[in-house]
């Protein structure tokens, strides 16, 4: 059943984000830093506050809610099953008269009872939501999403999400999940030693600084982007970031000048780029025809540098979705994908190898300004751009899916260029 208003949620352990789709167009995105394990009882009122902030109708019955999550990994839960159930309980308590749909890593939307029965199918599936959205416009690409804590490296082949892993342990094993992010990663988890004054200096393992301090000092993040508590409890400013960075090598600002602080920050940033670039090469080795990366997330600047280091061309998702929405990509993706599934004009296509309806063109997507700490509102598309988007979808709806062959118990998508070879065989 079609529904004009769709809310897409990305409920994480330290951030909760929502995107509002109105009539098939992205109307607004907003989010708030929120450490779930510090105040779990605040989640229900927070969901209501964010829905209101995003401009969702006040009557629950007028909104369909789609959700993806990573909050189930919080240490407050003994199992992921328990965490998934907690998040779904909170959504149903916040919006008791609304329909809730849960995004699964394989691209399905599940009703809450089914999601509770298959917790590993929906746990930490936000990467897949973004990948499914990107696949609509980029049938052969590598999605690189660097957030506050982790990096997702997802291959898209023949318009299909071709991730080797589905769960976090599988993705860590495949190189498609890298535990380094633009904000929360401790300095000692980035590098064990750094070059300083002509020597290799060991890095302390005391939690003195995090990635956000290096990127704040370098100017790649603004103080408003530093949305987690600092390691020392002092403000998120360049001055205090420099003090935290000095302690990485057990020094202080009386011992290290600005040049030395820059050496520490640059070494940490460089180590992150090198690690992500190595993971990119590993994933691309399985799909050597991929030559373009779609980059997004708070750490898009790191993703771009790593992609270029790995020899890929770069397309910022923000150029197509808007900068604000791109920072909240999983929430925006869930909302847009669910809206398309529920649209009477675009019937649902089911199955792990089916091609989703195509997304609106970049011209018809909402443009947005640089995100504020809490809320961003992309401009609504004009009626002319919506009409152009509909015409473009009609013109582009016919391209055939790349060949999908069955090998053993699995499915493999082959590039269109191999059709001729297979027909000869």
Residue ranges and their predicted role:
Residues 1-5, 395-401:
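Extreme N-terminus of proteins, especially the signal/transit-peptide cleavage junction
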Residues 75, 397-425:
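Nucleotide/pyrophosphate-binding catalytic subdomain
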Residues 1-13, 19-144, 154-349:
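Nucleotide/phosphate-binding catalytic cleft detector across ATP-hydrolyzing
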Residues 14, 149, 410:
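Conserved Rossmann-like nucleotide-cofactor binding loop
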């Amino acid at each position: 059943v079609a529904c004009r208003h769709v809310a897409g949620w990305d409920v994480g352990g330290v951030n909760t984000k929502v995107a509002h789709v109105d009539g098939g167009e992205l109307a607004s995105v907003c989010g708030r830093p929120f450490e779930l394990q510090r105040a779990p009882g605040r989640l229900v009122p927070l969901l209501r506050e964010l829905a209101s902030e995003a401009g969702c109708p006040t009557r629950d019955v007028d909104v369909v809610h789609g959700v993806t999550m990573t909050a189930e990994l919080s240490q407050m839960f003994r199992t992921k099953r328990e965490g998934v159930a907690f998040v779904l309980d909170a959504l149903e308590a916040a919006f008791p008269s609304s329909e809730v749909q849960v995004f699964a890593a394989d691209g399905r939307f599940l009703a809450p009872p089914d999601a509770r029965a298959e917790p590993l199918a929906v746990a930490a599936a936000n990467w897949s939501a973004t990948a499914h959205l990107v696949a609509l416009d980029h049938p052969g690409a590598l999605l690189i999403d660097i957030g506050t804590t982790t990096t997702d490296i997802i291959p898209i082949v023949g318009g299909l999400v071709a991730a080797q892993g589905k769960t976090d342990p599988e993705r860590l094993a495949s190189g498609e999940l890298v535990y380094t992010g633009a904000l929360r990663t401790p300095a000692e988890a980035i590098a064990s030693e750094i070059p300083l004054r002509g020597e290799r200096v060991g890095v302390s393992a005391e939690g003195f600084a995090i990635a956000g301090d290096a990127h704040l000092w370098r100017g790649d993040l603004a103080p408003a982007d530093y949305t987690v508590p600092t390691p020392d409890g002092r403000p998120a400013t360049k001055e205090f970031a420099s003090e935290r960075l000095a302690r990485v090598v057990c020094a202080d600002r009386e011992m290290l000048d600005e040049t030395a602080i820059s050496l520490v920050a640059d070494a940490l940033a460089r180590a992150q780029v090198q690690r992500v670039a190595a993971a990119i090469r590993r994933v691309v080795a399985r799909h050597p025809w991929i030559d373009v990366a779609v980059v997004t997330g708070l750490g898009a600047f790191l993703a771009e540098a790593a992609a270029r280091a790995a020899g890929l061309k770069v397309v910022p998702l923000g150029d197509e979705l808007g900068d604000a929405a791109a920072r909240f990509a999983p929430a925006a993706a869930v909302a847009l994908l669910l809206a398309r599934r529920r649209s009477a004009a675009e019937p649902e296509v089911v199955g792990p190898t089916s091609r989703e309806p195509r997304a609106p063109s970049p011209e018809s997507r909402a443009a947005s300004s640089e995100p504020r700490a809490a809320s961003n509102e992309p401009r609504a598309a004009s009626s002319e751009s919506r009409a152009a988007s509909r015409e473009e979808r009609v013109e582009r709806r016919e391209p055939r899916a790349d060949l999908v062959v069955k090998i053993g118990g699995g499915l493999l998508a082959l590039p269109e260029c191999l059709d001729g070879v297979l027909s000869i065989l």
